Amino acid sequence: SFTVEGLTDRQIVKYQKDFWSTLNDRNKVSKNILLNHHVRPVTVGEKRILRIDVPAADRHDKPVYIGTDPMKGTYKRDYEGDFLCTEEAVRAMFADQRDVSGDVEVLDEFGLDVLNQDTIKGYRIIFEQLHSGHPWNALENDEFLMKLRAAAKNKKGTLSPTIAGLLFFGEAYRITEVFPNYFLDYREECNDKAVRWLFRTHSNEGDWSGNIYDFFCKVRTRIDDDVAVPFANRRDGYRVDRVDVHDALEEALANALAHANYYGRRGILVVKKGKELSISNPGTIRVTKEEFYAGGNSDPRNPNILKMFGFVNVGERAGSGVDKIMTAWAEQNWKKPEFDFSERSDRVTLKLEV
């Protein structure tokens, strides 16, 4: 337990002066993100103390570090205290500073032959069904991919995939040339410890493309078939076999794929065990938790990937996905979805009752 000893007025003035002096010394702290109201004297019982509130740093300011070396002076705080960030986590913070979408970067060293033609064909079929009469439907594949910003002209004037295009339509073995830790994994597990899993598919199997769009389609089918929700009825009396729960699940999966840091370790992991589904992606959220739950400002790490999902009616560009998930689960009277924001492992995990 702690005992409040209190400070004198003179001590408060001195500590405030010393604190601000240190905080504004660039040899000691990389950036001062505090304002005057964050440091103020307060009364606890009959004792005076100095209260310091440290706000969450905006992604444009991260990393905020001690000393002059970000690799040795960047710390994060979790429920157990402060811990030194890995160099990988620090590099991810620098990458997240950019406002320009990183997933539209052109991969000059690749041609469009690294993309899977069957994936593109399947995507275009869905696109045409949803957007009949759209002018893009008449385009050749190369032009269509350019409209999606899945491809662009490289320095030589020929076409190359963008990062979004490679991840969305590419072959897994070519994706790992850019993202060595890239791995997409879906498992169906049971409580029998003698059985590792009931079903599994992952991006390194070799008998399918391994890209994020085909992974999404494969996993969506498995999840849709197992979700026990009642049929919904339209006003005309006909029933429909898809309700908000299915849409919310699709959005949760698409959001994980669009918000993932593909340079991070361990990749995407989706696990279904009994009535629980967990969806985990590398990369922490780029907004505050309050903004995350409020919706309207999702700030995706890979916005063009989210846009390509949006063209086939998956995902919410406006950032209302969390609200949709919460509402859908509440309507079914299911357990409230849980988000785990792991600072140590730089991952976000969503746990759902299905």
What would you call each of these model-derived segments?
Residues 248:
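Conserved N-box helix within the HATPase_c
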Residues 1-245, 254-354:
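Conserved N-terminal catalytic/coupling substructures associated with nucleotide/phosphate chemistry
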Residues 251:
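Active-site alpha-helix of zinc metalloproteases
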